């Protein structure tokens, strides 16, 4: 759908949404986002110009439907997919893309580390109508034969350029983790839990050199300018357990990310900030407020956070609790967690469970934040429930398939789609029906009492 839009800007040296926003230009992508968010296109432009909103939309991903990530728009969710060296295939990853989009993912990250990474990424981008993000360090490691010590600047930049050409709309770059942060890491219970962060730590400590993603940040920005790739500044030092939450390492890196965000904005590159992780419920608001302070209100994109470390097998629930609070307090996008977190590679079924948990969290947060129209669907569901409109209830549910499946387990016959009860209470104990009968009887009695008395003749 974007082919013509992109072609009209083909002669421009810098083709980022931020570049146009600064020039006072409302792009077709901005108009599209404004329409689906039900806010003005000028507000979208202003929020992009201020760095508070991004539209990740690589110029080469033309079948992408633009979407906005920022405090002015509804809370978004990301679905992580990707192969490992032990599991999955191209077909399985494409199936995860389809499931992600069906159940409401706003963006998808391809975190593949096994198989033919270029083929997988190409297939994922072609199959997706939502922006695709990547963590380029995985491809870099693949290209240096899994020996991170062989990383060099040319390989690093060539991988970024290749992925930008393929149509990746945002990169997670581990650029805020510095050598000076290592003493803070040494105090932790769990050290570095970011895959990309741990790889960079290995390289930095072996060569006793600064993080190359930090050192060559300006070169990365040039690639982003050319293809309108947004940067998701990665939190290499996110806490991996409650004991490490809100520590020196986490916030030292966050301050660096804030400085790098300013450099990205100066170069007309869109940017968001990644956040934790594992955080006790009572610390989430402080984490959000400090991110706003250190990063000048750049969109905050968090993983969870998980509010307990003992929910193995149910981490999608443990993290959705934290995600809801985080979004309520100002986080712009939530990275989902599946039931397989900490246990294994998620399959399509796990992807569905993770997305639905996070759709609930994001929607609840939007209601709490008072977004215009956020509760309309809930009110429509209440009307459908009270009127026993079962098909409408299924339609309004975040997961219509699951709602219908559970209803039909006990009452599968089509006649029960018109029944004024379900299998929970049956026809005699339904509170809705009892309430309706009470008011019906009361209204009938009132009607009788107000009838004029017949004249005696």
Curated annotation (Swiss-Prot):
Please give the InterPro entries that the UniProt record associates with this protein: ThiC (IPR037509), ThiC/Bza_core_dom (IPR038521), ThiC/BzaA/B (IPR002817)
The reply on keyword 4Fe-4S is yes
* The entry's keywords: 4Fe-4S, Iron, Iron-sulfur, Lyase, Metal-binding, S-adenosyl-L-methionine, Thiamine biosynthesis, Zinc
Positions contributing to Zn(2+) binding? 278, 342
Which cofactors are reported in the record for this sequence?
[4Fe-4S] cluster
Indicate which residues the UniProt annotation says bind [4Fe-4S] cluster: 422, 425, 430
Q: Where does substrate bind?
A: 80, 109, 138, 174, 194-196, 235-238, 274, 301
Q: Per the record, what are the reactions this protein catalyses? A: 5-amino-1-(5-phospho-beta-D-ribosyl)imidazole + S-adenosyl-L-methionine = 4-amino-2-methyl-5-(phosphooxymethyl)pyrimidine + CO + 5'-deoxyadenosine + formate + L-methionine + 3 H(+)
What detail does the entry give on cofactor binding? Binds 1 [4Fe-4S] cluster per subunit. The cluster is coordinated with 3 cysteines and an exchangeable S-adenosyl-L-methionine.
- Identify the Pfam families for this entry: ThiC_Rad_SAM
Tell me the pathway. Answer: Cofactor biosynthesis; thiamine diphosphate biosynthesis
Q: Where would you find the membrane-spanning parts of this chain?
A: none
Q: Which family does it belong to?
A: Belongs to the ThiC family.
What's this protein's function?
Catalyzes the synthesis of the hydroxymethylpyrimidine phosphate (HMP-P) moiety of thiamine from aminoimidazole ribotide (AIR) in a radical S-adenosyl-L-methionine (SAM)-dependent reaction.
Q: What is this protein called?
A: Phosphomethylpyrimidine synthase
Q: Which organism is it from?
A: Helicobacter hepaticus (strain ATCC 51449 / 3B1)
